[in-house]
């Protein structure tokens, strides 16, 4: 698991790094992603040792510190230490995740925008849906079209400041949040109908998260639909820069995704840089997946099956690894959001599940 966290924004009911307990919940950034689950794993390992369990293999806990970026930590670790034969990452969902979509973090130059737009800014991390977008526009701009949009308007030093708000969430699940940039681009495009760059972003990138409006609704049976999410927006020398989080189906190649995107974009559109994490697909009939499902189903008295996600964990960096928890089916999604928390009851429950999972993994002879 990992100890690094995504940035915090305003609006928390408790200090985001205070670990305050309210109504049986520990509030703070990282409580679910991923410090809380790693604490559960630590106590699970300690309890297993104290029980007198005699493993056939070595149990190792790996703590990373760059998972939210490019996983440079685990890449370095792999050059220094022999990788485990099998592993879990407590950084996803229960019951067990055996499929993770490919991740393509893109840095885009979309093109020139009107001189009437002096600045536009949103977000700080590619993999977080921004909950605030601001823009500075020239005072001469006709703002009457803004009446149709949910935009705050303020005067600042002889210029007009526009603000749009949304709901932050994980970039792998953009449909669970509200991207503040969408309303901003639609509003600016309405005020500047002849601006091709703004029109492209508003009409193609801010209509849905599955590539339908953009022209590449990629999908497969194994992992589902592609998703794309605007994470960071800036204006440099009049050019609109966007950091885009793309999660693509496992049966597609990243090169195909890039070409499909460029084919359906305006001429000025460029992918300046891209950070790619290849998809993961571990056989559902593997001893690891079957063993973990057995542990989870016994604890929860159910018959759950492995699932696919758009999120990315250390699992794709290790030879035989899958994400196992910590989020339980039906629980409120709080990862990367304001007021992230972990229920103490759930923390105790996941610790018990991890204890049983460690025992199961350590007893496996055939991998």
Tell where the protein language model's regions lie, with residue ranges:
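Short helix-loop-beta-strand segments that form the rim/entrance of peptidase-like active sites
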Residues: 48-67
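An extended, acidic, His-containing surface patch that forms the Zn2+-binding/catalytic region
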Residues: 172-237, 243, 247-256, 268-364
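Glycine/charged-rich beta-loop-alpha catalytic/anionic-binding loops adjacent to active sites
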Residues: 17-30, 158-168, 335-336
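A common structural junction motif
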Residues: 4, 147-154, 191-192, 263-268, ...
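Active-site alpha-helical elements of protease catalytic centers
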Residues: 30-45
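Midchain, well-structured core segments that form catalytic/ion-binding scaffolds
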Residues: 68, 74-249
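Acidic/His- and Gly-rich active-site-bordering loop/insert found
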Residues: 1-29, 50-55
């Amino acid at each position: 698991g990992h100890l690094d966290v995504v940035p915090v924004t305003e609006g928390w009911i408790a200090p985001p790094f205070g670990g305050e307990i309210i109504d049986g919940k520990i509030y703070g950034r990282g409580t679910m992603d991923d410090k809380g689950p790693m604490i559960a794993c630590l106590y699970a390992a300690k309890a297993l040792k104290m029980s007198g369990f005699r493993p056939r293999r070595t149990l190792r806990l790996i703590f990373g510190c760059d998972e939210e970026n490019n996983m440079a930590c685990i890449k370095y670790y792999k050059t220094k230490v022999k990788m485990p034969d099998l592993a879990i990452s407590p950084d996803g969902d229960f019951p067990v995740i055996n499929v993770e979509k490919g991740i393509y973090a893109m840095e885009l130059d979309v093109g020139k925008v009107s001189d009437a737009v002096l600045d536009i800014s949103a977000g700080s991390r590619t993999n977080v849906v921004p909950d605030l977008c601001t823009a500075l526009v020239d005072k001469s701009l006709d703002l009457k079209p803004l009446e149709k949009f949910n935009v705050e308007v303020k005067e600042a030093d002889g210029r007009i400041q526009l603000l749009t708000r949304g709901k932050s969430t994980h970039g792998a699940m953009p449909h669970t949040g509200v991207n503040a940039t969408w309303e901003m681009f639609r509003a600016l495009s309405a005020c500047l109908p002849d601006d091709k760059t703004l029109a492209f972003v508003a009409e193609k990138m801010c209509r849905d998260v599955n590539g339908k409006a953009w022209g590449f609704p990629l999908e497969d049976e194994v992992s589902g639909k592609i998703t794309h999410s605007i994470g960071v927006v800036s204006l440099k020398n009049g050019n609109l820069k966007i950091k885009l989080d793309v999660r693509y189906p496992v049966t597609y190649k990243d090169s195909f995704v890039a070409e499909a995107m460029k084919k359906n974009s305006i001429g000025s559109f460029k992918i300046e840089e891209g950070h790619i994490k290849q998809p993961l697909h571990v056989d559902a009939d593997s001893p690891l997946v079957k063993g973990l499902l057995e542990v989870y189903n016994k604890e929860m008295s159910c018959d759950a099956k492995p699932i696919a996600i758009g999120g990315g964990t250390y699992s794709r960096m290790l030879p035989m690894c899958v994400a196992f928890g910590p989020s339980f089916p039906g629980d409120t999604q709080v990862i990367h959001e304001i007021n992230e928390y972990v229920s103490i009851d759930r923390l105790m429950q996941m610790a018990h599940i991890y204890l049983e999972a460690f025992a199961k993994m350590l007893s496996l002879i055939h991998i």
